[in-house]
Structures are given as structure tokens and as C-alpha cells.
UniProtKB/Swiss-Prot annotation:
Annotated Basic residues bias: 253-264
Lineage top rank: taxon: Bacteria
Isomerase as UniProt keyword: no
HAMAP family membership: Ribosomal_uL2_B
UniProt lineage: Bacteria, Pseudomonadati, Pseudomonadota, Gammaproteobacteria, Enterobacterales
Cellular component aspect of the GO annotation: large ribosomal subunit
The protein's name in its UniProt record: Large ribosomal subunit protein uL2
Length: 273
């Protein structure tokens, strides 16, 4: 994998930094694991904008990725790695010994032809999936479940991982990249190793049009708007003369937004500021 800085042959190329991976499959994705994916444009079922800065972008097909990894004690061979437009990490197409194919998140360090397996007593090897209670303390894992059997929810983006730091009766303690320490049931599953494509963070789009290709619309400053559009709008000059707020008048700097108090008891230490 190489990080390539483009030559400034035009203003749109001057700042572009690409991540080139020659291992990615150049053909079409596996058709049996594709589904139609429609765009919302950031609107809800009433047609109202609920998420700003979303719209347009290239058409995508959804790749069905196996986050549960619950096909136990059947070995699978890594056939190829593919680009997935719906996530920052790459995906791997694996072929089980019984002939079934599935997509999984491509872990860092595995190669085409490697064998991986899931199960209660799977070896501690990159790409294998097993319950947290059977994984040694200190191991880096990804695609970690929060509820047994629901499928991995933590550490799925490019280059991410969590570290297993302790066990306490029926719970395992995890240290997240953010610094948060949280508990989850020890019979939840996780995959050994880190998610691949960690160079994704070095990628620079380089121009506004590249953001439009991936469905991101412009972000306009509130102070550049009219008073009818934003609390910061209007007035002479650039000063808006009040504490910064959202377009709906809610404090925007430092205000806590977490509402899920039901799971607060599982968070031992909140993330670092």
C-alpha cells in the first residue's frame, strides 16, 4: 500500500493525496452479496432535512458484510480483497470449506490464501473470531459485539481496534482508542487483530468536487447567513455577538449530547477530552 501525492498539474490536483492498494480486486463485486442502496438526501419520511450536508454522490450498491462471524468450526480461505464505498475499511471475500462465500472486514496483516476460522476454541490468530472470555488479556481485537449474537458494533472503521484489559465475573473490560474504558459481556464475540487500511486517515480529497462525489454537500457558516436562517446571521461585519449556538439555538461548544443513560453503568471511564 502506497501513499501518493499528486503532481500539481491543475488546481484540483495540487492538494490530492491518494492511498494506492494494488492488492484490491479490480473486477466486479460478488453479486450474491449485493443489495440495492437508495439515497435519502438527509431527509426523513416527511421529506424534512434531519441531517445537513448530505446529498448527491455516486450511486452505490450495499455489500452484505458478515459482522456476526457465527459460522463455527468451518475453515475459510481469503479469496480476494475489495474496495467498499460504504465504509473506510476494505473488505475480504472468504470461501468456506462448504462452498459458501461471505464478506468480512479485512484485518490488518492477512493475505490472500490465508485460512481463518470462527468458534469457541479458535486459535488466537489475526482474523479469527471467538468469545472475549477465550481471548488473552492484552490482545488487540476489532468488530466487538455489545450484545451476544447481535454482531460486531465497536471498532469497525479503518485502522481501529480495542484492547482487552481485564475480566470481572461475566464482563470483559475494553479500552477504546478514544480512551474510554467500558464493560461488555464476556460471551460477546470479537475478531483478533486490527482493521486494515489504516492509511485511510492520510487521504486528502483535494477539492470540493471530490466531496460531492461521495455525497457530502457544502457546510455554510452561520455568520454568513441571514437572520432568518441562523441565530448567527445578519449584522455588520463578522461578529455575531453571542455564545455560539446551533441553527436551532442550542449551545454548540462543550454541551453534553449523550442521552443513553441506560448504558452508563457499563462505562468505567469516559473518553478523553
Amino acid at each position: 500500500m502506497a501513499v501518493v501525492k499528486c503532481k500539481p498539474t491543475s488546481p484540483g490536483r495540487r492538494h490530492v493525496i491518494k492511498v494506492v492498494n494494488n492488492e484490491l480486486y479490480k473486477g466486479k463485486p460478488y453479486s450474491l452479496l449485493l443489495r440495492k442502496k437508495s439515497k435519502s438526501g438527509g431527509r426523513n419520511n416527511n421529506g424534512r432535512i434531519t441531517t445537513r450536508h448530505i446529498g448527491g454522490g455516486h450511486k452505490r450498491a450495499y455489500r452484505i458484510v458478515d459482522f456476526k462471524r457465527n459460522k463455527d468450526d468451518i475453515g475459510a480461505t481469503v479469496e480476494r480483497f475489495e474496495y467498499d464505498p460504504n465504509r473506510s475499511s476494505n473488505i475480504a471475500l472468504i470461501l468456506y470449506k462448504d462452498g459458501e462465500r461471505k464478506y468480512i472486514l479485512a484485518p490488518k496483516g492477512i493475505k490472500i490464501g490465508d485460512t481463518i476460522i470462527s468458534g469457541l476454541r479458535a486459535p488466537i490468530k489475526t482474523g479469527n473470531t471467538l468469545p472475549l472470555k477465550n481471548i488473552p488479556v492484552g490482545t488487540f481485537v476489532h468488530n466487538v459485539e455489545l450484545k451476544p449474537g447481535k454482531g460486531g458494533q465497536i471498532a469497525r472503521s479503518a485502522g481501529s481496534y480495542v484492547q482487552l484489559v481485564a475480566f470481572d465475573e461475566e464482563y470483559a473490560t475494553l479500552r477504546l482508542r478514544s480512551g474510554e474504558m467500558r464493560k461488555t459481556q464476556s460471551n460477546c464475540r470479537a475478531t483478533i487483530g486490527e482493521v486494515g487500511n489504516s492509511e485511510h486517515m492520510l487521504k486528502v480529497l483535494g477539492k470540493a468536487g471530490a466531496s460531492r462525489w461521495i455525497g457530502i454537500r457544502p457546510t455554510v457558516r452561520g455568520t454568513a447567513m441571514n437572520p432568518v436562517d441562523h441565530p448567527h446571521g445578519g449584522g455588520e461585519g463578522r461578529n455575531f455577538g453571542k455564545h455560539p449556538v446551533t441553527p436551532w439555538g442550542i449551545q454548540t461548544k462543550g454541551k453534553k449530547t449523550r442521552k443513553n443513560k441506560r448504558t452508563d453503568k457499563f462505562i468505567l471511564r469516559h473518553r478523553r477530552k
